[in-house]
Amino acid sequence: MSVDHTWYFDDFEVGQVHTTMGRTVTETDLVNFVTFSGIFEEVFINAEYAKSSSLFKGRAVPGLLIVVVAEGLYVQTGHTHHGRAYLGLDELRLSAPVLCDDTIHVEVSVESARLSRSRPGHGILAMRHRVLNQNGVEVISYKTTRLLACRPSPEQPTRDGQPARDGAPA
C-alpha cells in the first residue's frame, strides 16, 4: 500500500470515502492489549471460558482494541500526515463481535469540513468510521473530529522556514 503524505485539509470533500487495507486481529494482539490496558476480564484471558461460556463461543477482542487498530489503519493511509490535533471521538457503537483471527478494514467517509475559526490555516474534519469484518459485517462505527493543516500557499514558509513546494509539509 502506498502512503500519500500530500493530503491537506483542502483535499478532503464531504462525501468522500476512503477504504483502508485489511488487518487480521491476532491472539497476540489480544494478549498484548489486555496486558497493557489491565482489562483482565475472563472472557479475554481464559480460552476455555470463552469457548464454553461467552456469548460468542470464542475469544472476543475488546472493542477498544478494535478502535485503536482501526485508527492505525487509517493513519497508515497517510491522510492524517498534516493532522494537528485529534479533537474528538463520538457516537461509538459496537454492533458485532470481533474474534481472534478476524480480519477488519475501515471505510472512512467525510461528513463535514469547515475552516477553523480559532486556528488560521487549519480546517476541521468530521469523519464517520465503519469497521467491517472479513464478511462485510459492520462491527464498530464511530465519528472522529480532527484539525488538519490547510495546503500552504507558495509564498507561505514551511516548518523549516523555506518557501512551500507542492507536497511540502506546512
Report the location of each language-model feature.
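HotDog/MaoC-like acyl-thioester-processing domains
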Residues: 1-13, 94, 98-170
